């Protein structure tokens, strides 16, 4: 699918701790579980009168979003603020990049301002890896989504949602439905589910929206929604990403909904206590019926809540790991 994940050792320091968070590929189950456990411990912060812990006090987190995202940007801002960090969000449309400045120059200038961490969202696959390896090696880099490649914090918030509603992964059947081809969320979810021991991972979609070689993720492939949803515990619907499509991959959105839209009738094929998830934004009447999105099976708003806790966990763990790596390198340079 993509060679970018071959660079995964870059994410860990000499102790195996997180120092960047770029992809879920190759990260050990123990580390993913630690992220989930840490996020669980942060959930109660949102219920406090003063929603703050001092873990990143005195640190500066820069959100550098070259792609628009209300949900991801806002939850990263809230996560950093709840950790007591100073937060800067770069509006790329009004920044120097719109005047011809390169990604390299933009981030180098931010690094010179003594930022401690960058959360980067970019349309190009591999952008976060490039930044971590070549641009700002001493700054913790968090991937907020890069092209079709990865969206690791979305993957982890989805895992937290599943674990909190289902208790674990060992006996689950999970279906990921829709535009698999263009979805970095699908890739991150497949990697996370496999690493966490989910025995039955299914991808469902039209042949034109299924990536070549998707089977290498250890998934079962279905092109019939009713068949693929049979007896599943979790249904993860994906947004139809028209902005990334070229050519005639779909005859129409109406035809897609007719064959792959999740309706109350189709959801009946899943287990009675199945949960329905969606990374947002939702296209009602395209990939999901409003009655399902707003119904008793939906945990979509829970995903948003859990996203803040997951991002708090990742920010705090990556900052700690980067600090440990910096200290190790300084001691060995003497």
Curated annotation (Swiss-Prot):
Pathway(s) annotated for this protein in UniProt: Pyrimidine metabolism; UMP biosynthesis via de novo pathway; (S)-dihydroorotate from bicarbonate: step 2/3
One GO cellular component term: cytosol
Top-rank EC class of the record's enzyme: transferase
Residues reported in the UniProt entry to bind carbamoyl phosphate: 71-72, 121, 151, 154, 280-281
Biological process terms in GO annotation: 'de novo' pyrimidine nucleobase biosynthetic process; 'de novo' UMP biosynthetic process; amino acid metabolic process
GO MF, any single term: amino acid binding
The protein's Enzyme Commission number: 2.1.3.2
Matching InterPro entries: Asp/Orn_carbamoyltranf_P-bd, Asp/Orn_carbamoylTrfase, Asp/Orn_carbamoylTrfase_sf, Asp_carbamoyltransf, Asp_carbamoyltransf_Asp/Orn-bd
Annotated residues for binding of L-aspartate: 99, 184, 239
Catalytic activity from the UniProt record: carbamoyl phosphate + L-aspartate = N-carbamoyl-L-aspartate + phosphate + H(+)
Key words, A-Z: Pyrimidine biosynthesis, Transferase
Quaternary data: Heterododecamer (2C3:3R2) of six catalytic PyrB chains organized as two trimers (C3), and six regulatory PyrI chains organized as three dimers (R2).
Role this protein plays: Catalyzes the condensation of carbamoyl phosphate and aspartate to form carbamoyl aspartate and inorganic phosphate, the committed step in the de novo pyrimidine nucleotide biosynthesis pathway.
NCBIfam families registered for this protein in UniProt: asp_carb_tr, PRK00856.1
HAMAP family referenced in this protein's UniProt entry, alphabetically: Asp_carb_tr (MF_00001)
Entry's family note: Belongs to the aspartate/ornithine carbamoyltransferase superfamily. ATCase family.
Protein name per the record: Aspartate carbamoyltransferase catalytic subunit
Top-level taxonomy: Bacteria, Pseudomonadati, Pseudomonadota, Gammaproteobacteria, Pseudomonadales
């Amino acid at each position: 699918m993509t060679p970018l994940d071959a660079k995964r050792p870059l994410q860990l320091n000499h102790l195996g701790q997180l120092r960047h968070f770029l992809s879920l590929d190759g990260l050990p189950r123990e580390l993913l579980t630690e992220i989930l456990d840490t996020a669980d411990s942060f959930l109660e912060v949102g219920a406090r009168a003063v929603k703050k812990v001092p873990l990143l006090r005195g640190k500066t987190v820069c959100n550098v979003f070259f792609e628009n995202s209300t949900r991801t940007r806002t939850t990263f801002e809230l996560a950093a603020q709840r950790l007591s960090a100073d937060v800067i969000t770069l509006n790329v449309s009004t920044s120097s990049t719109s005047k011809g400045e390169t990604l390299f120059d933009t981030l180098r200038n931010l690094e010179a301002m003594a930022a401690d961490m960058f959360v980067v969202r970019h349309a190009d696959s591999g952008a976060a890896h490039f930044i971590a390896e070549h641009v700002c090696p001493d700054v913790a880099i968090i991937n907020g989504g890069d092209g079709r490649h990865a969206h690791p914090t979305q993957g982890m918030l989805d895992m937290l949602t599943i674990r909190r509603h289902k208790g674990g992964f060992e006996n689950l059947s999970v279906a990921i439905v829709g535009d698999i081809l263009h979805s970095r969320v699908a890739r991150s979810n497949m990697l996370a589910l496999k690493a966490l021991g989910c025995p039955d991972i299914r991808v469902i979609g039209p042949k034109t929206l299924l990536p070549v070689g998707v089977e290498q993720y250890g998934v079962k492939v279905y092109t019939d929604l009713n068949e693929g949803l049979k007896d599943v515990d979790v249904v993860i619907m994906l947004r139809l990403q028209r902005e990334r499509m070229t050519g005639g991959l779909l005859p129409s959105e109406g035809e897609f909904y007719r064959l792959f839209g999740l309706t109350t009738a189709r959801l009946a094929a899943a287990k009675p206590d199945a949960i329905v998830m969606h990374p947002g934004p939702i296209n009602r009447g395209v990939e999901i019926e409003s009655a399902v999105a707003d119904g008793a099976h939906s945990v979509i708003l829970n995903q948003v809540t859990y996203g803040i806790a997951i991002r708090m966990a990742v920010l705090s763990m990556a900052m700690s790991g980067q600090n440990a790596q910096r200290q190790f390198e300084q001691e060995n340079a003497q």
